[in-house]
């Protein structure tokens, strides 16, 4: 008889008076009923040939082979093809570099002198799209005075419609750099194409990868070759594991300075632009050591939703906020409806500061 007991997430297998901790079992192979001894041995050999140890558990209704060792690079289908195997289940997460189990301490990412993670909040503010030097300069000055420590602005804009404003491109990037020199805020902007990797690596302090490119694996691999930190937004339909695995692509390619950004997921609800998944913060805090910030602007798509969602995100333990701020949102070329005016952003940060103090953080 197989018995499993759960206590504080620690499971034990009891079999033939031998106790194996659940944490030692990294993959479980469930065999089909009435599998012969010969076939059990064959499957065990398949496992050991991959450099793993096995632990056989015989139950009244099923037989299970527990795989002990590093299974992160092993495809379960290698075992599923055997005629005696019913199913294979991973117990060990397939990501390693991003895994808190291998890196218990929270990571703190330095963005040109601004630390994201730990006790200080990363506060990213600015317009959805760069429209002019004067526009970005005014917003940056006011946002910095309110407490923002990074400047965002879209130079290249991924739009659903090919007829929508696509951004100023390299001209917009030059404007951001000029405002950075004037105001002193490090800049954050989205990279869409590998052809701009070199110029972004030279000029951008925090390179943003948008939701649409979260699983652009060729691009993620290239980002691993850069020495700039990466802000990785969650895809519209991405699970937690898929999101972390995308971060793992960047880290496995050589760049471990990755910040995760929750920006809402697509659900059945159509009243809001997306649904902000705030429970991702404690979940990811448990699964990974990477910093987690929240973008409440893109989540709701409405400016009046930004304030309550931003405060809720900080209360839930987010390491920062990415908020769209515009001096004239009614005339904005992109996403004006979800942008805060500078005075509203200033009022919001005063409240955020109070919440941050309660949870041991500061602006």
Where are the model-predicted features located?
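Non-catalytic terminal accessory/regulatory regions of metabolic enzymes
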Residues: 3, 10-123
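Catalytic beta/alpha-barrel core
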Residues: 32, 185-193, 205-216, 229-240, ...
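Active-site-adjacent beta->alpha loops and helix N-cap segments on the catalytic face
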Residues: 101-105, 161-174, 195-196, 211-227, ...
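Active-site mouth loops of central-metabolism enzymes
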Residues: 121-138, 162-166, 188-190, 211, ...
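Hydrophobic faces of well-ordered beta-strands that scaffold small-molecule active sites
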Residues: 122-127, 151-153, 187-189, 207-209, ...
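Glycine-rich, proline-tolerant flexible connector loops at the mouths of alpha/beta enzymes
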Residues: 152-170, 327-339
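Alpha-helix-loop-beta-strand connector modules within alpha/beta enzyme cores
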Residues: 166-188, 223-229, 280-292, 338-360
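Catalytic alpha/beta core domains of metabolic enzymes, predominantly
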Residues: 226-325
